[in-house]
Amino acid sequence: MVKIISDSTCDLSQEVLERYDIDIIPLHIVKGDEELEDGPQIDIHALYEWADKNKTTPKTSAPSIETAMNVMRPYIDEGREIICFSISSEMSTSINVIRMAAEELDAEDKVTVIDSRNLSTGIGLLVVEAAVMAADGKSREEIKTGIDELIPKVRASFVVDTLVYLYRGGRCNAVSALIGGALALHPMIVVKDGKMDASRKYRGKIGKVIKNYAKDLEEDLKNARPDRVFITHSECDARTVEEVRDYIASLGIFKEIIETRAGGVISSHCGPGTLGVLFIAK
């Protein structure tokens, strides 16, 4: 069976990773002189406290080649083929590191590296689809073809409580135009062509903004594939998250609504109070 691997920016929970037998290659987070591997052990609240205290955003970087090799090696040694997903190449060099790791293992003919053109559970949606296909006995080529068809259909967006983290991180150029005197704005950030861009803008308290954002997605949600939808957030109010879940459930579209928390890398760039609804269009 083809082994499915992703870098850590897919933001899939440990339960989902175990259910679908997915392995993770961690990116790195740098807080001053301290370097951490992205993963469930990262204390997101402490990450934000450090950022606010130091008035800066943690730096993030691609995995090391050694780490990527160590994750892939056992499966190569077993003679298995691998499909490995990376965050959009427009946002990180993670994909290059994974490709170099495959070369170092002399396994280019056994490893397919896919540029998700996305982030967070926008990647996670593709990773889970690939894992389902692998479990169904599909070949590496068949999985790659299926995923290539799905990549442009992924709908990834989120709203943020503060523009500061996106601005400091420099990953969304549109935020620079909003930052001057517009800190009360809560933009809807969408992933398009592998990059982040600002879409519609909301004003008001973040709890109300998040609920309006979810309702504004209704027509798109009605045209989504019904298998699953992700609600992914970072340090969001639990009641607000539950209200979004209840609203999506009330539409009666999805077989599964999966709540996940954004990992360390994604949280470092989006900031606290961020929530996204991510799905695949039909």
List each language-model region with its residue ranges.
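Mixed-charge interfacial surface used for oligomerization/domain docking
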Residues: K3, T9-D23, H28, E34, ...
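Class I S-adenosyl-L-methionine
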Residues: E35-E104
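Short, flexible active-site-proximal loops enriched in glycine and acidic residues
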Residues: R80-C84, K110-D115
